[in-house]
Amino acid sequence: WDTRWGPSDAFTVHGLWPDTCDGKMLPSNGCDPQRAYTNISSIIRADSMELHDNMNTYWPSNKGDNNWFWTHEWVKHGTCVSTLEPRCYGTGYTSQEEVVDYFSTILKLRAKYDIYKALAASGITPTKPEAGRRPKNTYTLAQFKAALKDAWGVEPNVKCRGRRLQEVWLWFKVRGRDDYYPVAPWGSDSCYRIAYEQKH
């Protein structure tokens, strides 16, 4: 939750990060140097301007260079999604189609598991920040976790910087190529009282 980026009524995406079955992260430089594409924006635009526009809206870089951010996420994480390896597509594989599938799957998950709407359904909405002051209006970690558990049956991990909400991590397992379903978190939270402030 970055108050400087994305729609005022939506969480933006950081990525979809595959882990090993025992919860360990995969190599930091990705899993397939042959597919370490650097022109993600061009690949997506060539396939779907609608997807590209949605990525610009819901997956912006907080450093201002979306293509660099998407390339980083693809190389480090996308190349490690085993179900997106070209051999999984069979004889009908078209070069780079797995890139489009990776990003479109993530945006579908973002829409299906809409954190903003799930929190709002439990009465948890962003509050107006007070300039130069510590946030007074806060929610508890238990409130956040309960709201999202009510929506999807499992709790997330909630991450803060100080008291300010930074990220909500959802954990999934996958059946086949794209049947993702939420599961209990394997990580830890870094919040107690949460300042969930309006975007500006």
Q: Where are the regions a protein language model picked out?
A:
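C-terminal, well-folded lobe of enzymatic/effector domains
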Residues: 56-200
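An N-terminal structural lobe/cap that precedes and organizes the functional/catalytic core
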Residues: 1-54
